[in-house]
């Protein structure tokens, strides 16, 4: 019989995984992230019934980085017809590093999916075309979904990323050369880096992403965020592309739709049941949280949960 969730079980899982701390590496290509202590470990679970469970550093905020790509995609889904989005970005795994230009050149400026950097930049370009204040709108979205009114961007992280943005700028200009990028590159990059610099805790992330476990409905402000079909589509993209080139290994070990960020966070969804957020800043070779993935693996084994 599968275990019942409680805080004691989560504490036990973190204790089992804690020996992994020190075996990964904190992201150092963004100086503002390199200063984060690697000795952090956290988990929070929010269920569709409204229960919240947590352990470790679950209320400490960190830079969510690429987890924000799910939120920007959801924002675009609310502004554009389906065909308008998917004619500019694909739905397939890339099998390449998240900041690769090679595949983008070969495939004439159309990114494989919205969760690699190129795809997320196209989505941000689309938001720039439709929203008068894209950064403020994103803050409004996460504040509504989380029920937390003081969520904000980490200006130091956003500035640090912009100062080291040569590769992302190259990606944007390459797509512009193929006609798949319409706005000012620097403006869109600033929006993109601010989204990545959102500071949230595991508790806030689990609450924010609960709508993906509940057919697109957010209980925190009692309305649909996306349609049930759109929620299913986002979960499918997370399952195939949310963990970069490690998606297959993650599906094997954990078996849930998930999205990671180089800040060490991972959000995972058990459809119809719960949203899970874990955090540990040290990364593996593919840019995913080393201990965070291990926590999710042990959790799904304990609970007997998988979408496969």
From Swiss-Prot:
Transmembrane segments: none annotated. InterPro entries: Beta-lactam/transpept-like, Glutaminase. The keyword Hydrolase applies. Keywords: Hydrolase. The keyword Hydrolase applies. One of its GO terms (biological process) is glutamate biosynthetic process. Substrate binds at residues 66, 117, 161, 168, 192, 244, 262. Its EC number is 3.5.1.2. GO terms for molecular function: glutaminase activity. It catalyses: L-glutamine + H2O = L-glutamate + NH4(+). PANTHER family: GLUTAMINASE. Belongs to the glutaminase family. NCBIfam families: Gln_ase, PRK00971.1-1, PRK00971.1-2. Homotetramer. This is Glutaminase. It comes from Enterobacter sp. (strain 638).
